[in-house]
Design a protein with these regions (language model features):
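Immediate post-signal-peptide N-terminus of mature secreted/exported proteins
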Residues: 21-67, 144-147
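Sec-dependent N-terminal signal peptides
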Residues: 1-16
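N-terminal cationic leader/targeting segments used for protein routing and processing
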Residues: 3-4, 18, 26, 32, ...
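Amphipathic alpha-helical interaction modules
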Residues: 48-93
Length: 147
């Protein structure tokens, strides 16, 4: 009976490890996709800049996840997906607004949500806030965000 239980436990551990590797590979694939989009000269500059932010945010997540012992691949996958969804929703909401003041309100709401919810509490604000006050990007969000 012990052997049977140990076999089941071992099988579950192996399955969990495969899932973790699959999640990590998916996040790396997401990064490769946005990097390709970022470097695609047939895309307009705004699309490429949004892809640049996504690329940097995914790189930041992967890097910080590797440095944080209790940060699992599952959490990495959740954060990566949430970041992509957050940015896509922001771009969609921004495109729906016609007046500059309404666009500014959307930007302020999303920017404040990003800055108010750090994930890693990274003290390096020069890196984490690199996009926050950069007028050249519509994605003025903190990289250290609990998406």
């Amino acid at each position: 009976m012990k052997k049977y239980v140990l076999t089941i436990v071992f099988a579950c551990l192996v399955a969990a490890n495969v899932s973790a590797q699959a999640i990590y590979k998916e996040v790396v694939a997401m990064k490769a996709h946005v990097e390709k989009l970022m470097n695609d000269s047939t895309q307009n500059m705004q699309t490429r800049k949004v892809a640049c932010f996504k690329n940097d945010a995914l790189y930041y997540l992967i890097d910080k996840a590797a440095d944080t012992p209790d940060f699992t691949e599952y959490m990495l996958g959740e954060q990566a997906t949430a970041m992509i969804d957050f940015v896509n929703l922001y771009v969609k909401r921004l495109s729906q607004e016609r007046k500059k003041k309404d666009k500014d309100i959307v930007l302020a709401l999303f920017k404040n949500a990003s800055c108010a919810h750090p994930l890693f509490d990274d003290p390096d604000k020069e890196v984490t806030y690199g996009y926050v006050d950069n007028e050249q990007y519509i994605t003025q969000f903190a990289l250290d965000t609990d998406w």
